[in-house]
Amino acid sequence: MSTLFQALQAEKNADDVSVHVKTISTEDLPKDGVLIKVAYSGINYKDGLAGKAGGNIVREYPLILGIDAAGTVVSSNDPRFAEGDEVIATSYELGVSRDGGLSEYASVPGDWLVPLPQNLSLKEAMVYGTAGFTAALSVHRLEQNGLSPEKGSVLVTGATGGVGGIAVSMLNKRGYDVVASTGNREAADYLKQLGASEVISREDVYDGTLKALSKQQWQGAVDPVGGKQLASLLSKIQYGGSVAVSGLTGGGEVPATVYPFILRGVSLLGIDSVYCPMDVRAAVWERMSSDLKPDQLLTIVDREVSLEETPGALKDILQNRIQGRVIVKL
């Protein structure tokens, strides 16, 4: 039996993209997925790009937006999931080439679903969303590569964003001395509330000049920024340290030299939260419900919005008017 529901749909008209709340039937959703009643979704920078012309995210219009969703299984042909199961969906092709999670119902392939860990609520899962998973995967990879609290401080760039803010909180929970870098000087108190022991400006990381090697300052870094700032911070990582890079808000080109790698043994770790293998994905989500779960997780929430308020929030995230995470209650 079909059900009518509300969803945030992007449509393309000539060279323009418009985003509106539409009434849609479950009959119109893909038939090859697990049908989920969505409780919460979240807004990521990628969602903002998907809702604008020239964003180069959406493959084909019209499309329901939203790369994240958390909710309860309504029906399933997949033996791994049954009616009533609580699940999380992040990334893959959700909200890119397949109808996404900014919707009261979503149809998601079972291969893309993670069972909700016991110590996590559906709301908390979307406070995390793709941003939180990216932060957790960054910390996970850094620790696999030798990061440990006794070796020195850890830098987090873009710290007022979703990935950066959650990374600050997670690292603090793990006992690290966290240095948060931001372009927003007024955010110092907020970042210290999240767990930063020191807040520095982005100019302290990259002052406009690039050196092959600089004074060693941090044992590692979580970097969702990229660009010249990444090139600069690589030159300041301690011997044997690592940088986990997950974004390019500072640019896609990194004008670095090989010297940090060949003279200091620095490692550059690529963080892909979109197609991360399911065994790693599930293991990291378990950590997000336990040793990586910040005591102050909800502090990262900038606002909670309705579906009708979501188009405005999508514009805000592209214009850097959001500090932390925006979650959407369906």
From Swiss-Prot:
Protein name per its UniProtKB record: Putative quinone oxidoreductase YhfP
InterPro entries found in the cross-reference section: Acrylyl-CoA_reductase_AcuI, ADH-like_C, ADH-like_N, GroES-like_sf, NAD(P)-bd_dom_sf, PKS_ER, Zn-ADH-like_protein
Residues given in the record as NADP(+) binding sites: 45, 160-163, 182-184, 202, 248, 262, 273, 320
EC number(s) from the headed UniProt entry: 1.6.5.-
Keywords linked to the UniProt accession: Cytoplasm, NADP, Oxidoreductase
Gene3D superfamilies: Medium-chain alcohol dehydrogenases, catalytic domain (3.90.180.10), NAD(P)-binding Rossmann-like Domain (3.40.50.720)
Residue ranges of coiled coil: none
Complex formation: Homodimer, or homotetramer.
